[in-house]
Amino acid sequence: MLKTRQCLLGIRTFLGVTSRIWSFFLYILRKHLRTIIQYQTVRYDILPLSPISRNRLNAVKRKILVLDLDETLIHSHHDGVLRPTVRPGTPPDFILKVVIDKHPVRFFVHKRPHVDFFLEVVSQWYELVVFTASMEIYGSAVADKLDNNRGILKRRYYRQHCTLDLGSYIKDLSVVHSDLSSIVILDNSPGAYRSHPDNAIPIKSWFSDPSDTALLNLLPMLDALRFTSDVRSVLSRNLHQHRLW
C-alpha cells in the first residue's frame, strides 16, 4: 500500500514538473515566433499587367487614396503620457519635437508594422493624400518622417480642413477632390468619414501589436479597387460596418 502511494506521488510529481517544463517551452516558442513574425521579410509581388488589364486601367481615372495617421499608420504619445497599450520600454521609431502654444512637446512615435512597405507599394497605384484631424505642426512632421524624402505624401490636410460637429472632426473628401468616384479613405475612425461611408475602407485601430498585418491584408483589395470606374460600387456594400482588417 505504501509503495503504491509513493508510486502515485512520484507520478504526480513527474507530471507536475513535465507540465511546468512544457508551459515554459511554449512560452519561449511563442516569444520567438512573435519576434520572427515582426522582422520577417515581406513581399507582395507586383506582376506585369496583361494587355486586357492594362487597357482597363488606362480607361479609368487614377484613384486617390486618403490616409489617416494616428492609430491607422502610426501611434504616438507625448511626454509624461504612456498609454497602457504601449509596453513600457518599447523604443519609438522616431521622436518629434514640436512647439504647441509656446510649449515644447516631444512625441514618441511608433510605426504600424509594414507601413513603409505598404506606402511603397500603394504609391505606385494611387495618388496618396494625408488627411489627419491632428494639428498641422504635428501632422506635417509625422508625414515628413513617413515620406522619408520619397515625395509620395505631398498633398496633406489637417485639423483646419476638417468640420467640427458635436465635438468630432469630420473629413470632407470633397476638399480633396470633387469627383468622389475616385477617392478612397483609409481611417480607423468611422466618425471621421461618416459623411462619405461609401468611400471608406475600415481598419482596426493600432496601438502596439508587433504582429499586426492589417496593412498587408489590404494590398490585394487596393490592387483590385484601382480598376473600378467608381470605388463606391464596391465600398458601398456596408464595409464600413465591419472590422475586416
Curated annotation (Swiss-Prot):
Alphabetical list of SUPFAM superfamilies matching this protein: HAD-like (SSF56784)
Keyword Membrane found: yes
TM annotation in the entry: 7-29
Cellular compartment(s): Endoplasmic reticulum membrane; Nucleus membrane
Pfam families referenced in this protein's UniProt entry, alphabetically: NIF
Top-rank EC class of the record's enzyme: hydrolase
Classification via CDD domains: HAD_FCP1-like
Chief localization: endoplasmic reticulum
Catalytic reaction list: O-phospho-L-seryl-[protein] + H2O = L-seryl-[protein] + phosphate; O-phospho-L-threonyl-[protein] + H2O = L-threonyl-[protein] + phosphate
Protein family according to the UniProt entry: Belongs to the dullard family.
Protein's recorded name: CTD nuclear envelope phosphatase 1A
Native source organism of the sequence: Danio rerio (Zebrafish)
